[in-house]
């Protein structure tokens, strides 16, 4: 296994590892809260699900595993917040550790890491543009960031799958 501090983000749409049709779960890991999003069964559109509070007892891991089971997720995508200098900081290490712990709970469902630089900033901007006041953003910002992480993964996956299709049609 690759040491956590050297683990790069995964790439969507790899035919050897893509689970095919089915819902994907997107997760934005924060220090206090975890945003959760889910895709439709065709893996085209990400929508918010809920915000899970973190705690020391691991209840948040149980809830995330329960959501993966309830939603019949075929893949779980955890945001990896690398620095702009492409390094792993404390937040990224936390995301990797949560992904590894969750992977043990949801096996054999794969848990992937997705590059998520600036998704919270992007989510805040989108909420602000939608007219959501700053005081109201806290309740949904984690879910919005999870949607951004998952939607990016889904879009990259579709593009990669289309490229694979074109290559096999030639």
From Swiss-Prot:
Its EC number is 3.1.-.-. It holds the Pfam family RuvX. It comes from the Bacteria. InterPro entries: RNaseH-like_sf (IPR012337), YqgF (IPR005227), YqgF/RNaseH-like_dom (IPR006641), YqgF/RNaseH-like_dom_sf (IPR037027). Residues 1-25 are annotated as: Disordered. It is an enzyme of class 3 (hydrolase). GO terms for molecular function: nuclease activity. GO terms for cellular component: cytosol. SMART domains: YqgFc. Its main location: cytoplasm. It is found in: Cytoplasm. The keyword Iron does not apply. Residues 7-21 have a biased composition (Basic and acidic residues). GO terms for biological process: rRNA 5'-end processing. Keywords: Cytoplasm, Hydrolase, Nuclease, Ribosome biogenesis. Could be a nuclease involved in processing of the 5'-end of pre-16S rRNA. PANTHER family: POLYNUCLEOTIDYL TRANSFERASE, RIBONUCLEASE H-LIKE SUPERFAMILY PROTEIN. Belongs to the YqgF nuclease family. Was identified as a high-confidence drug target. This is Putative pre-16S rRNA nuclease. It comes from Mycobacterium tuberculosis (strain ATCC 25618 / H37Rv).
């Amino acid at each position: 296994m690759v040491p956590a501090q050297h683990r790069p983000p995964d790439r969507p749409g790899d035919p050897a590892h893509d689970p095919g049709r089915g819902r994907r779960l997107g997760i934005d890991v924060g220090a206090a809260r975890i945003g959760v999003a889910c895709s439709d069964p065709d893996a085209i559109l990400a929508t918010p699900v809920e915000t899970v509070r973190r705690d020391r007892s691991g209840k948040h891991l149980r809830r995330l595993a329960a959501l993966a089971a309830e939603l019949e997720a075929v893949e779980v995508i955890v945001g990896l917040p690398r620095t702009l200098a492409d390094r792993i900081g404390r937040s990224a290490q936390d995301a990797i550790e949560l992904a590894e712990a969750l992977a043990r709970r949801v096996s054999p469902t794969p848990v992937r890491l997705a590059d998520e630089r600036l998704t919270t900033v992007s989510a805040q901007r989108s909420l602000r543009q939608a007219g959501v006041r700053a005081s109201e953003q806290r309740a949904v910002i984690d879910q919005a960031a999870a949607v951004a992480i998952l939607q990016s993964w889904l879009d990259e996956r579709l593009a990669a799958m289309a490229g694979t299709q074109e290559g096999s049609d030639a």
